[in-house]
Amino acid sequence: MNPFRWSFRAQFLLGFLACAGLLAYAIYVQLHLGLEPCPLCIFQRIAFAALAVFFLIGALHGPRAAGARKVYGVLSFIAAGVGMGIGARHVWVQIRPKDMMSSCGPPLSFLSETMGPFEVFRTVLTGTGDCGNIDWRFLGLSMPMWSMVWFVGLALWALSAGFKARRSSLHH
């Protein structure tokens, strides 16, 4: 069973399940392994959640029209692209020399209570302290690096599903 030959609905369902699994693992790492997320981690989670929503809506809708499938593909690609941008910033913060680090700033909850949304976004993206810590690795890659890998893969998956016409036994 080649997943690239699956129906749009099945491919978008798989994309949703991948995002849900990644978010579940992030919560597991936080609650059971004690790794608190930094503000950039939280923004990456939001990007994965947005991507999951687009995948789920696309899977539930299962449009027959090629144009509608393309819209879902592009929306999902944009959500993944935002996640890639945040992930790239996070990786950059992690690879900077430690002597160039500054504080990541106050917690996100405090920022959101005292600033507008655009100021919070700008402040979080300029934070570097805790965001630069590497507390977890798998196969030599940090969690933000793995997020980048997943965002790239899911972006390509969304475009592949949205821009290829296909009919299969898994259609509905």
UniProtKB/Swiss-Prot annotation:
Q: Where are the transmembrane segments?
A: 12-28, 47-63, 71-88, 146-164
InterPro entries the record matches: DiS_bond_form_DsbB/BdbC (IPR003752), Disulphide_bond_form_DsbB (IPR022920), DsbB (IPR050183), DsbB-like_sf (IPR023380)
The keyword Protein biosynthesis is annotated on this UniProt entry: no
Record GO biological process: protein folding
Q: How does it sit in the membrane?
A: Multi-pass membrane protein
Among SUPFAM superfamilies, the record links this protein to: DsbB-like
Disulfide bonds, paired cysteine numbers: C38-C41, C104-C131
Record keywords = Cell inner membrane, Cell membrane, Chaperone, Disulfide bond, Electron transport, Membrane, Oxidoreductase, Redox-active center, Transmembrane, Transmembrane helix, Transport
Name the job this protein performs: Required for disulfide bond formation in some periplasmic proteins. Acts by oxidizing the DsbA protein.
Q: Which family does it belong to?
A: Belongs to the DsbB family.
Q: Which HAMAP family match?
A: DsbB
Q: What is this protein called?
A: Disulfide bond formation protein B
Organism (species): Xanthomonas oryzae pv. oryzae (strain KACC10331 / KXO85)
- Provide the organism lineage as a comma list: Bacteria, Pseudomonadati, Pseudomonadota, Gammaproteobacteria, Lysobacterales
